Amino acid sequence: MATDGGPLAASSASLDSSLSPLHASPSPSSTYTASSLALSAPAIAASFSVASTFSNSLIPPPPLPPPTPSTMAGWFGWVFSFFFQVIPSVLYWVITFATITLPTWLFTLFSMSLTFTMNFTTLLLIALAIVSTISWFIRYRFLNMYSRLPSEPQRKEPHLDLFPDVQEGDSKPGLANYLDEFLSAIKVFGYLERPVFHELTRTMQTRKLIAGETLMLEEEKGFCLVVDGLVQIFVKSMRDGKPNVDEGSNHMGAESSDEDDHRVDGKQGYQLLTEVKNGASMSSLFSILSLFTEDIQLRASEGSSSSASSVGPSTNARVSDSFPASPHGLEDSPRSNFVRDHGDSVAHISNSNGELLPSVPPLNLGESHAMPIQEPYPKPRSQPGKRRRKSVHPDIVARAMVDTTIAIIPASAFRRLTRVYPRATAHIVQVILTRLQRVTFATAHSYLGLNNDVLGIEKQMTKFTTQDLPNEMRGAALDRLKDKFIKERDRLGPEEIIKGIALHNPFAGRRRRSSSFLRKEAVLHAKMAAQSKRPVSMASPEDISGDRESAGPSPGDLLSTIQLSRFGPRYEHLAPKLLSPLTDKENPPFMAPVMHSSPFHRKKDAVDEDALFRESILDCIMNGIGLTSSTRDVLRKSSHTSGDISPKLLSYDSRRQKAVFTNNAFGFIDPYDSSADGETESMMSMSMTSAGGTSPIVNLREELRNDIEIVYFPQGSVLVEQGERHPGLYYVIDGFLDVGIPVSDKGEDLVGGSRPVYGQPPEEFFPTLKRTTTSSSRVSGVTSATNDTKRKRQSRKSLYLIKPGGIQGYVGSVASYRSYTDVVAKTDVYVGFLPRSSLERIAERYPIALLTLAKRLTSLLPRLLLHIDFALEWVQVSAGQVIYHQGDESDAIYLVLNGRLRSVLEGTDGKITVVGEYGQGESVGELEVMTESTRPATLHAIRDTELAKFPRSLFNSLAQEHPGITIQVSKLIAQRMRDLVELPMPEKGGEHANVGSVKTAASVVNLRTVGILPVTAGVPVVEFGHRLQNALHQIGVTNGVTSLNQAAILNHLGRHAFSKMGKLKLSQYLADLEEKYGMVLYIADTNVNSPWTQTCITQADCILLVGLAESSPSIGEYERFLLGMKTTARKELVLLHSERYCPPGLTRQWLKNRMWINGGHHHIQMGFRLTPEPSHPQAKRLGAVLKQRVQVIQAEIQKYTSRRIRQTPLYSAQTPFKGDFHRLARRLCGRSVGLVLGGGGARGIAQVGVIKALEEAGIPIDIIGGTSIGSFIGALYARDADVVPMYGRAKKFAGRMASMWRFMLDLTYPTTSYTTGHEFNRGIFKTFGDSQIEDFWLEYYCNTTNISKSRPEFHSSGYTWRYVRASMSLAGLIPPICDEGSMLLDGGYIDNLTVTHMKGLGADVIFAVDVGSIDDNTPQGYGDSLSGFWTVLNRWNPFSACPNPPTLSEIQARLAYVSSIDNLERAKNTPGCLYMRPPIDPYGTLEFGKFDEIYQVGYAYGKQYLEKLRSEGSLPLPEETEEKKKLQRTLAPRRASI
């Protein structure tokens, strides 16, 4: 084998050697035969040579097999072979491919020659295909980006959830129900301290009445309430044999239902007044007042003897039998002697059973073991010359319909309460007087039209208050006083004089004195008196009526007083006489304080007649209000007698009061006092210092002397306006005051005078003299200008005159009522003025003033008002409680005293539609009561609400005796029905018809409370609340605005304000504030779980959720708490922006998860810190301190640099009334200014000029609505609230629309429309981009016509370009736009000027700009048939006298706009609508090329129209507020420099 195959063997060896690296260890099974190798050796050799070459050129060599780890040398060999064999092979392959293989391929490719031969047609087709492909890509992939925006459908209006009514009437059985009914009945007394509550209820008794049993309430001597059962109250239809009704009344009653007319004993006819159910009182408010005031004298002229006897026995025996008492003495009566002899036992027996009372009604007060009724006691009541007063319940009978349980608090409990707790009594009387005004007087005057009965009380009150000046203050002294005003009158102009000239008061600055300091002095003096075992009131009467020389008490006075008391009675009586300027007329009242220390430094030649006038006026006022020296002397004597005769009882009371009150955490605090020092006082100290007012420390008279102002008013000046709070008391020195009412107010405002009187300056805490010129200042600021212009010229009706010596404003000032009349200076008049705050201090320290007023009111009350007061029920309902359900029987009319109600209609499909909301002073339910139909809707309370329930039985009774009441209520119903006809509600029944929304006109009118709630912690709600309050002040809210936070509440009510018992006091305090101010802001500045946050939610008519726009839109913790409260109040979202810009889509992120936002949203620009400092500072480390310091420095630098780097905002308010907070304030007040823009094609360019004219005139625009081109222009302005970007974008869009090439390129086969709509879409999309309506700075909407569902739709959310495009879609020219399966077209087909919808959103004044075309109304007479050929010839015949008949397209267009014409005429006659139509008739619908010309036409017309309104005085400018401030009362009167 070796010899034969030498060459083959050599080649095989070489092959083996070359393959050896690849196969280091060949398999032993691989065997080859010699023959096979010999036959294929050349082929194999050639193949292997090629393979080796190719592998060397393309494939890198494989890696070396790993060496055997037997020795270290193997490892080194493997690494050596890898570096020196594999790597060079790879480099060789890369270099070979780059330098040889790749160039060879390229050379071969480029050396080839290809030849294509095509004709022109082929080239043209190819070019056309390329162009078509590119145009398709640009058209459908680039230019129609608007069609690929993410789906953002309109936001659905939230549905209202009526939470289940858990406050059903008889839900609690047993004792709990009994207690609840009793507590609900005594709520009329307001907040009761624990000892006061025990004092009232410890003698309470219960009585069972069987069905059919009658009770004569005119003989009942106590407070009666129904605990369980049903009682009907009847009144006699005749009195003293004289019918009070016409002859037909009995026949009317006989024909009516059995419940309206009853006969008792077959003699007298009775009429049903009301039905009293569980938890209601059988006593009226006047009867409660009579229980407190039966021992009070009516006038100061009755003398000290009679007055002394009137109170003495009451305090002696603690039981008086004079209900309703004669104010004359009973000292010699056997009963008085009996009570003196028996002491405490008689008091307890009489208090517990009340059997010593005269004229005991035939009531069996249950089982008792008291002494039998003694007949001789009532007989001495009839003394000669003394007439017994009639009952306050004349001719009133109660009858039990079922077995009934009643509770009776006897009159003795009220008398004892008056004596032991005089300040608490005064507080209760104040509450009852307030509710008397809110319930009875307001209902009778404003609702029933009983002006004569209500105003007659004030007229008759003058006989009690008239007090003449001393003789020495008349004649020459009065002439000298008048001479002091002459120079000032000559110096000032008529406009300044009519405001009033006040005499200079040098000591006016000393009026304000810390009430807390006076309280501490009073408590200290009371403790000193208690330690010395002497009564506080041992001084002489001159000590009370006298006046110390100093301007106010001081600590030095306390020391001097104590020293005088130590010297003995002689000096004790001498000091007041020496220190009283009334006893020594030559005393200069305003000496220096150093002279006051000695009573002997007086100069007779330093007589100050001004001070004497002030003191004389003060004496007359104090006598007029019942605060006389004899009264106080009597109270002082009564307190001595009580202490001397029954010292055991006095000590028991003092111990009991002190023990109970010390343990009681809720000290008595006056609701109008901001000091919390009263919590440290005891009941005894208050009773001793306030009953007689005898503390020489708290010498109120010294303070009041400096509060008296002497003011001159020329003839015609208005001192008090109807509907406002009395600024104080006016004492007429010389001249006459005319008291009257505007004639038109009787018919204009039938519902309580609570309708806002805008433009009045806010009421200050100390409202000094405020003057007006005429009654024209009653005009509202931006309410309907036409109605207010008419009101200016209406006359007034004079009621009576106030002569010299008379007092005006007594009832209103002491009881904090609003004035029912105007008070005008009949002649030049000189008056003394005492502010209302001074009267409040008098009432606080001397409860006798309130009790005297209550006594006088009960004595002057007409019988009609008494019956109305008896039948009216004061009802308190909780938030969410349903008052009546849909379909219930209508049994009463409800008048809202405080709170807010909502009426909702429950549909068959479960949807809830808001019918209306009712605020303070409004009524609901008259139509159902008069028609005796069922309730058409469900009425529930949005928050805690006080109502006056006017039962149908009372209405029927009054209708028979007083038909004028029926006429008055009929006028009210007729006015409401007319409003429903003239201002229809927005269309219902669709997805976009605001079903369930509370965003209606009724929901923004008469808002009284607004809660400001943050979304999450860190939102600056306090600063936001203050800015909003300032804006509300500037726009002029009636009666002013106040804001409350937790600190303010704690300052007023103490730290226990939010406790279980303190909530009663808190609710009453908040109700008083809401009645006092026009709007109250509740700022939730505490943590989320605090009671104050809960109070802010429950007390709010509207809740503003304030969030930072740049922060996370997730649900905050305050919102979760709000949802847990289940409140039904209107909720609005307020987004705070650092800059006046809202990124597209931001608002949708906030609203997406907040379906409970049912009142809209607002964008507000307000500077704030995005990273507020933490409220709870953490432990400060060195690194944290440095980091915090750096952050502070960085924030300070950014404050001065970052805002300058940014571009200036697009809009800056030129007037302060165009700010965001003013816009929100007008929205809350229902005084928003709306702008409605109509459609008309290119004629709508004139609207740009009108808007510019409005902005230059300073008129703010709050809501914008538009149709067709009006929707486009309105959206441009609402987006930035500035005319500059609006003008630029509108002109750019007009340029695109003026290009005919764009429309020619957009033409298509006219199956649906002539164009595809793409160019139109592009023009609108290039203007608005992807912005959404929610992101607009101003509230905006546009309307469209849904031809799929044949209804109009209003869009206020979603992409702007889509709904603006839909609102501008003319049928036939542009295809309808599809929205959720519906086809939308131009909104002008149904309503081209959407004034009605704008009015429904709450806009008060609406500027409506109409640019539509005018239809050709030429009469046609072509006959009954018409030839088309004749029509064509007639059009071309210039001599034809026949008008051209309309074409087919014209007929279709007119047919499409039929309903729009009717809505346009209705819009022109809408109250508050200012209709504007620029002269744009010569311009066509598509003449967008004349932009500048049409713009100038609109601008010139707008300026001319607004100037015309300004000259007529009907322009609703905010600047008018400044002018009205000149006409109305100034903040402080101009003082004469005399």
Curated annotation (Swiss-Prot):
Active site per UniProt: 1268 (nucleophile), 1386 (proton acceptor)
One GO term of the biological process aspect: regulation of phospholipid biosynthetic process
Keywords: Endoplasmic reticulum, Hydrolase, Lipid degradation, Lipid metabolism, Membrane, Repeat, Transmembrane, Transmembrane helix
Binding site for a nucleoside 3',5'-cyclic phosphate 1: 692-811
Biased segments, Low complexity type: 302-314
Keyword Repeat recorded: yes
Subcellular location(s) per record: Endoplasmic reticulum membrane
Enzyme class label: hydrolase
PROSITE patterns, sorted: CNMP_BINDING_3, PNPLA
Entry membrane topology: Multi-pass membrane protein
GO MF annotations in UniProt: lysophospholipase activity
Superkingdom of this protein's organism: Eukaryota
Short motif (GXGXXG): ranges: 1239-1244
Annotated motif DGA/G, positions: 1386-1388
Motif GXSXG location, chain numbering: 1266-1270
Region (Disordered): 242-264, 302-393, 529-559, 1517-1538
Transmembrane segments: 75-95, 118-138
Function: Intracellular phospholipase B that catalyzes the double deacylation of phosphatidylcholine (PC) to glycerophosphocholine (GroPCho). Plays an important role in membrane lipid homeostasis. Responsible for the rapid PC turnover in response to inositol, elevated temperatures, or when choline is present in the growth medium.
Protein name: Lysophospholipase nte1
Record organism: Aspergillus oryzae (strain ATCC 42149 / RIB 40)
Gene symbol of the encoding locus: nte1
